[in-house]
A protein has these predicted regions:
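Extracytoplasmic mature domains of secreted or surface-exposed proteins
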Residues: 1-172
Length: 172
């Protein structure tokens, strides 16, 4: 869709998302779209629940080039100002490596080893606040520490002690 709301005829995604659904999208400054969800294919290509699409509608082959992606749903995305993307959901691996429901991707779609976090249950939403990320979900532990359904993480993935509650919400 163009900025004025009209259909962009140059966007040609082929068959698009072949299975599952899209749960979240972010648009990068260069016009590329990153989508996440329960889908495993885009335009007939396996994408592992996260895909970056060029403005023309075709898969960006430089994003997570050849990686398997997430082994389960990716329900939330948060695009950082530096172009890195925090993802959350119900996955336990990304590209065959163990990650428990949250990780940050580099600009090329590969895992960012400088962000280390985990949750014991599904993450449903992410919100960037300053240099950190607020995480909401159905979890009771984050990084092995009691964090009931909501927690603020620092840029490294550690719990922000200035915004921390062990009682949390009754449901998010």
């Amino acid at each position: 869709i163009n900025a004025n709301g009209t259909l962009d005829a140059s966007f040609a995604p082929g068959t698009g998302f072949n299975s599952g659904y899209v749960a979240d999208i972010v648009v990068q400054p260069d016009g590329k779209v990153v989508a996440s969800g329960t889908f495993v294919n885009f335009a007939g290509t396996a994408v592992g629940r996260v895909v970056r699409i060029n403005p023309s509608g075709v898969i960006d082959p430089t994003f997570n080039n050849g990686g398997a992606g997430a082994n389960n749903w990716v329900l939330a995305l948060a695009l950082q100002p530096d172009g890195k993307i925090v993802i959350g959901g119900s996955f336990s691996t990304y590209n065959g490596v163990a990650y428990s429901r949250i990780l940050r991707l580099n600009t090329d779609g590969t895992p960012d080893a400088s962000f280390v976090a985990s949750a014991n249950n599904t993450i449903y939403d992410l919100l960037l606040i300053g240099s950190g990320v607020f995480v909401c979900g159905n979890f009771t532990l984050v990084n092995g520490t009691a964090a009931i359904r909501g927690v603020m993480l620092n840029a490294s993935g550690t719990i922000d002690a200035s915004f921390y509650s062990t009682t949390g919400a009754n449901g998010v």
